[in-house]
């Protein structure tokens, strides 16, 4: 049941000093914490609650944000404006109390829109690649000295978090399509990386997804989009297109592409003229496409290609995007947020560049997604040598009868010779070391809590190889 809609007047400015106190219900989330950070950095009184503390809440506390662990109406000190996200249910005691008292209540997307739409906004939308692309654009503007404000859906070391408050003209925001709220933004430059069905809990079918992106594109003063995506090319009116495959209508193209285990290199062409060479530390064709979007945006803003290329050459990626977690006993451990079949394929293709045995460890995210895309999931692990599947992270959804993750393991095994099912996530550190071999690349895939088992697995594998001197390269797990 959704929270009752409370349309806010367009003239209501969230930065009005008379509206200076905010309380975020679910402040530890990546999107909520970013907005809380932006407001706190501007001197507004901010508080928030969540079930558990995390690195993001601790970062906010260092700014003076008051954090309440757990949800209680006692957190509504001084009748603040209350901010919630689609993850918060109407029965939440804080949200229910705020509605009962008639407090100003913002959906996160409404607050973002109220801040973003008043500025020169660059909004990055798409089913895949939003975090990396928005981070790349932000890094380019930061490197160019433009001092942008950044609201990103992931942690980035370059600005030590998921948000940055700048004094420059431009705001760069990752735009979430999961609940349809992307249609609330009106960017100066809108970016769409691709369009697929990824949130069947909100959209009935792909047609609904396409219509939401069409509206977002129409609301963008300039739409920059990837013409390699069939749904983009067929259904959107694109102002500035980019392509890795030579699409004839793409103003920006990557040619003479070289993918290696340590870098990606390509010639970048603009409207038929060679701009120069681009070299990236982040790997894979998906990241080259993301970088090409950043090139297109930078050029629309008037930046010289040399400035853009220099910044992108230094960009090291966002957390949980093929993030190197460590090496133990000759095994390299990688954390990646991929949770859609297309993302899994792209990540494993990048892993294959290492020319090592690839062990893919996958935690499905949301029962509804697994059910809607089941056959695609069953066939997306072709680049892995070994596939290990753990139980689905439900994200609050009711579990179906039986184990959908076990059914997935059986289905993957119809297309793949080496599949292992682990029936309990806490058992993974006990089971996975027996699968691993020196030289392996262990890639943990998923948007849930699988990543919390990586360090424990590294410790367990270190213990296993401790009797074999010379193998453990990082024996810092006692």
From Swiss-Prot:
The UniProt entry, under Pfam families, shows: Mur_ligase, Mur_ligase_C, Mur_ligase_M
What does the record give as EC number? 6.3.2.8
Chief place of localization: cytoplasm
Q: In which pathway does it act?
A: Cell wall biogenesis; peptidoglycan biosynthesis
- List the GO molecular function terms: ATP binding; UDP-N-acetylmuramate-L-alanine ligase activity
Note the InterPro entries from the entry: Mur-like_cat_sf, Mur_ligase_C, Mur_ligase_C_dom_sf, Mur_ligase_cen, Mur_ligase_N, MurCDEF_pg_biosynth, UDP-N-AcMur_Ala_ligase_MurC
Q: Name one GO biological process term.
A: cell division
Q: Which SUPFAM superfamilies match?
A: MurCD N-terminal domain, MurD-like peptide ligases, catalytic domain, MurD-like peptide ligases, peptide-binding domain
What name does this protein carry? UDP-N-acetylmuramate--L-alanine ligase
Subcellular location per the Swiss-Prot or TrEMBL entry: Cytoplasm
- The record lists ATP as bound by 126-132
What is the recorded function of this protein according to its Swiss-Prot or TrEMBL entry? Cell wall formation.
What are its GO cellular component terms? Answer: cytoplasm
Arranged from A to Z, the UniProt key words for this protein are: ATP-binding, Cell cycle, Cell division, Cell shape, Cell wall biogenesis/degradation, Cytoplasm, Ligase, Nucleotide-binding, Peptidoglycan synthesis
Q: Which reaction does it catalyse?
A: UDP-N-acetyl-alpha-D-muramate + L-alanine + ATP = UDP-N-acetyl-alpha-D-muramoyl-L-alanine + ADP + phosphate + H(+)
Q: Which family does it belong to?
A: Belongs to the MurCDEF family.
């Amino acid at each position: 049941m959704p929270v009752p809609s409370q349309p806010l007047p367009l003239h209501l400015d969230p930065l009005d000093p008379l509206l200076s106190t905010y309380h975020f219900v679910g402040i530890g989330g990546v999107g909520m914490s970013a907005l809380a950070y932006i407001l706190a950095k501007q001197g507004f009184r901010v508080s928030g609650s969540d079930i558990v503390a995390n690195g993001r809440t601790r970062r906010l506390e260092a700014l003076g944000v008051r954090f309440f662990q757990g949800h209680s109406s006692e957190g509504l000190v001084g009748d603040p404006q209350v901010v919630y996200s689609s993850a918060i249910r109407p029965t939440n005691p804080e949200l229910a109390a705020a509605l009962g008292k008639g407090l100003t209540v913002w959906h996160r997307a409404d607050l973002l829109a109220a801040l973003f739409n008043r500025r020169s906004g660059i909004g990055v939308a798409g089913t895949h690649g939003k975090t990396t692309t928005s981070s790349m654009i932000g890094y380019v503007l930061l490197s160019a000295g433009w001092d942008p404000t950044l609201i990103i859906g992931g942690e980035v070391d370059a600005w030590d978090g998921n948000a940055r408050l700048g004094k420059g003209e431009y705001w760069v925001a990752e735009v979430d399509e999961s609940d349809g709220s992307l249609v609330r933004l009106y960017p100066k430059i809108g970016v769409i990386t691709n369009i697929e069905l990824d949130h069947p809990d909100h959209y009935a079918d792909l047609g609904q997804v396409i219509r939401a992106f069409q509206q977002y594109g129409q609301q963008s003063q300039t739409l920059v989009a990837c013409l390699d995506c069939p749904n983009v090319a067929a259904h959107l009116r694109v102002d500035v297109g980019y392509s890795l495959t030579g699409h004839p209508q793409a103003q920006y193209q990557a040619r003479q592409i070289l993918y290696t285990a340590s870098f990606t290199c390509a010639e970048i062409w603009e409207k038929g003229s060679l701009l120069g060479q681009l070299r990236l530390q982040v790997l894979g064709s998906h990241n080259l496409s993301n970088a090409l979007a950043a090139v297109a945006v930078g050029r629309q803003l008037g930046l010289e290609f040399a400035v853009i290329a220099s910044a992108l050459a230094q960009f090291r990626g966002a957390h949980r995007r093929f993030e190197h977690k460590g090496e133990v006993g000759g095994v390299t451990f990688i954390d990646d947020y991929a949770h859609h079949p297309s993302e899994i394929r792209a990540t494993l293709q990048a892993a294959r560049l290492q020319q090592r045995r690839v062990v893919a460890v996958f935690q499905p995210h949301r029962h509804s997604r697994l059910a809607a895309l089941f056959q695609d999931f069953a066939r997306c692990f072709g680049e892995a040598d070994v596939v290990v599947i753990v139980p689905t992270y439900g994200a609050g959804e009711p579990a179906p009868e039986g184990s959908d993750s076990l059914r997935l393991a059986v289905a993957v095994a119809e297309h793949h010779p080496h599949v292992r099912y682990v029936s309990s996530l806490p058992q993974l550190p006990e089971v996975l070391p027996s699968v691993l071999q020196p030289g392996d690349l262990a890639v943990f895939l998923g948007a849930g809590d699988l990543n919390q088992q990586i360090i424990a697995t590294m410790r367990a594998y270190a213990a296993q190889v401790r009797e074999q001197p010379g193998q453990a390269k990082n024996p810092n797990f006692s």
